[in-house]
Amino acid sequence: MNQLEQKLEQDFGIVFSQKDLLETAFTHTSYANEHRLLNISHNERLEFLGDAALQLVISVYLYNRYPNKPEGEMSKMRSTIVREESLAGFTKACGFEQYIRLGKGEEKSGGRERATILGDLWEAFLGALYLDQGLPAVEKFLNQVMIPQVEKGNFDRVIDYKTALQERLQVNGKVDITYTVIDESGPAHAKEFTMQVAVDGKELSTGFGKSKKLAEQAAAKSALEQLGN
């Protein structure tokens, strides 16, 4: 964690006084499960707290920034900003993914690149930052990293990857596109779904998500990337 601490101080001016919070934020359940005898804490509870802090900061920002936008539009913007893929992108942009502690199995299966894990890490980090330094520190950090992207208009439009994939594949005629859940993991309150998208019965790609809808979108996005779109 020393390298992570140095990075946080150098890049963002953040110095944690409670080092254990930072370590917990970067510990995935798979790592904790593989080291049960050490009684290591994982980041799910911090993720819960960080999600609330993130929602509040973004909500206040949108309320103040767009005084004429109706509630419905602001809700859509917020949903786009805090969606799993967006948070995963910010995690990678900050270089946080290299510091997360994963179990061996999760590491081998590509967990370090999985949007669900990276999005959860982002929220857990915010939760740890909130407990260590309060909401102003969370707001300051988000103003450094997330808000500039909102100001650039990068979240004005929600991309429907399923529709985009359908339009891409049906250019030359109708095809049968199906989405199938091929795996479910995690406790009941924190399920992760693995979705397979197939075209005319042939597997095209897979995706992961905390809900079936999110997993479908992830699978469709992955398929578009494979098709070079």
From Swiss-Prot:
Organism listed in the record: Streptococcus thermophilus (strain ATCC BAA-491 / LMD-9)
The protein's name in its UniProt record: Ribonuclease 3
UniProt-annotated location(s): Cytoplasm
Record function comment: Digests double-stranded RNA. Involved in the processing of primary rRNA transcript to yield the immediate precursors to the large and small rRNAs (23S and 16S). Also processes some mRNAs, and tRNAs when they are encoded in the rRNA operon. CRISPR (clustered regularly interspaced short palindromic repeat) is an adaptive immune system that provides protection against mobile genetic elements (viruses, transposable elements and conjugative plasmids). CRISPR clusters contain spacers, sequences complementary to antecedent mobile elements, and target invading nucleic acids. CRISPR clusters are transcribed and processed into CRISPR RNA (crRNA). In this organism endogenous ribonuclease 3 and Cas9 are required for correct coprocessing of pre-crRNA and the trans-encoded small RNA (tracrRNA).
List of residues binding Mg(2+): 47, 120, 123
Molecular function, one GO term: double-stranded RNA binding
Top-level division of the source organism's lineage: Bacteria
Required co-factors: Mg(2+)
Keywords attached to this entry: Cytoplasm, Endonuclease, Hydrolase, Magnesium, Metal-binding, mRNA processing, Nuclease, RNA-binding, rRNA processing, rRNA-binding, tRNA processing
